[in-house]
Swiss-Prot record:
First-tier enzyme category under EC: transferase
Active site: 108 (nucleophile), 112 (proton donor)
Record's protein name: Xyloglucan endotransglucosylase/hydrolase
Keyword annotations from UniProtKB, A to Z: Apoplast, Cell wall, Cell wall biogenesis/degradation, Disulfide bond, Glycoprotein, Glycosidase, Hydrolase, Secreted, Signal, Transferase
A GO BP entry: cell wall organization
Keyword check for Amino-acid biosynthesis: no
Compartments, as annotated in UniProt: Secreted, Cell wall; Secreted, Extracellular space, Apoplast
Length: 295
């Protein structure tokens, strides 16, 4: 039988070929109820828990968005969430899943899903803030429709690197480059947050496309509320020095050859913006970019 040449078929072939030599992925998250590790933070009446708290819906309408956060703060670990994004015409709508500290010179690790008009792909924007400095945006298209089913978005964070994953495929690496003068998140515990809100002043085509409220309510669905991190709400020094957790071990200090191959695939096929190659904003390439293999 002839093989289809559609983009989706090519993606499937790539993933099947990759599965023959699998890199070591982060551990699979364990599903637990929302209330075990998270609490609502605003617009409680725009959230709905289903199936005994194993599933959560965030609801955005013309009046308000909504959000939640983790109960504890964490310093290093593996942080994941199963998310199904709002469907249809979602221009102007942003769904975010991120870690952030709370002080002025804050650290932050971001997934932001930027909605689009019906038929146009959602954009996934990632960013890393260190010591209050961000401006490290990367944007990709996803190789699937993120509103059709749940997909897993996760961050591996240890003393050596931060890795963003989509369904265990690495889409971005931010290495510890302190020796190059680049700050790295290592001493500020972070909470996990997620929110759904209207950002039509910037999210879609730089704010040219406005939210169509005739399509509201917009609903983002969540599962997988386990947190596999070192809780530092009381004693951050323990998390920074103990080194016995699985994410500290040698196999998680760098990507292996197969993971770098997948990262290159994302960079070559799906990346639409990379701050490392933006010479208008950065005439001199940021120091971390070569180490992160982003050029």
């Amino acid at each position: 039988m002839a093989v289809s040449s559609t983009p989706w078929a090519l993606v499937a072939l790539f993933l099947m070929a990759s599965s023959t030599v699998m890199a070591i992925p982060p551990r699979k998250a364990i599903d637990v109820p929302f209330g075990r590790n998270y609490v609502p933070t605003w617009a409680f009446d725009h959230q709905k828990q289903l199936n005994g708290g194993s599933e959560l819906q965030l609801i955005l309408d013309k009046y308000t968005g909504t959000g939640f956060q983790s109960k504890g703060s964490y310093l290093f670990g593996h942080f994941s969430m199963h998310i199904k994004l709002p469907a249809g015409d979602t221009a102007g709508v942003v769904t975010a899943f991120y870690l952030s500290s709370t002080n002025n010179e804050h650290d932050e690790i971001d997934f932001e899903f930027l909605g689009n008009r019906t038929g146009q792909p959602v954009i996934l924007q990632t960013n890393v803030f260190t010591g209050g400095k961000g401006n490290r945006e990367q944007r990709i298209y996803l190789w699937f429709d993120p509103s059709k089913a749940y997909h897993t978005y996760s961050v591996l964070w240890n003393l050596y690197q931060i890795v963003f994953f989509v369904d265990n495929i690495p889409i971005r690496v931010f290495k510890n480059a302190k020796d190059l003068g680049v700050r790295f998140p290592f001493n500020q515990p972070m909470k996990l947050y997620s929110s759904l809100w209207n950002a039509d002043d910037w999210a879609t085509r730089g704010g040219l496309e406005k939210t169509n409220w005739a399509n509201a309510p917009f609903i983002a669905s969540y599962r997988g509320f386990h947190i596999d991190g070192c809780q530092a709400s009381v004693e951050a020094k323990y998390c920074a020095t103990q080194g016995r957790m699985w994410w500290d071990q040698n196999e998680f200090r760098d990507l292996d050859a197969e993971q770098y191959r997948r990262l290159k695939w994302v960079r070559m096929k799906w990346t639409i913006y990379n701050y490392c190659t933006d010479r208008t904003r950065f005439p001199v390439m940021p120091a971390e970019c070569r180490r992160d293999r982003d050029v």
